[in-house]
Amino acid sequence: MQRTLLTFALAVLVVSAPAFAQNQPNPQPNTNGTTREGSVNDRRQDQQGRIANGVQSGQLTAGETKNIEGREANLNREIKDDRSANGGKLTTQERQQVNHQQNNLSRSIYNDKHNANQAHYGNNEVGQRRENQQDRIAQGIRSGQMTAGEAARTENREQGINQQTRADRAANGGRLTGQEKRQINRQQNGASRQIYRQKHNNRVAPK
């Protein structure tokens, strides 16, 4: 009896397999020459999540994030323009081009996160504020409150502060004078306000 039931179950499984396969989504292009947009948008969000993780962990420096997010912003503009020219869709050729660019960006994110460059904050007030601001940027990128362009501009500003801090310390035996600390604090205040404005304006990352 058990053998009969097992044979019957296997027969049902074999018969139902083709029907199950037929019900799965078809990834082929639409008949009008355009392709579904899900994978482009999904990859975009996935890459922003990877960037956010790199920023928060310190694997991506401000300069690296600036460069990557600048490229992401350019790609986003290209996608927007292509869709506007084609009734809100990407053609198959455009999608292939976008996929190629996203592959290049993905490799850059991986390489930057695994190279020798790391964000080092140090156990001091200036370093702790830098780390806090990077965490806020990471949260804004991850949530979509900050666009790629906004993140690139903010990280460009953070990179400038980091370079000045490093130069000031190099000129003073590894320390900052009281005046230099006050100047850096003012710059960090300005960057902090910029982060807040970008996270609370009406611009969000494309979905």
Listing of model-derived features with the role each one plays in the protein:
Residues A52-S84:
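N-terminal, post-signal-peptide region of Sec/Tat-exported proteins
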Residues T7-S16:
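Bacterial N-terminal signal peptides
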Residues N23-D42:
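N-terminal propeptides/low-complexity segments immediately following signal peptides
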Residues A62-G70, T91-H100, A148-N156, T177-R186:
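Short, charged, amphipathic alpha-helical segments
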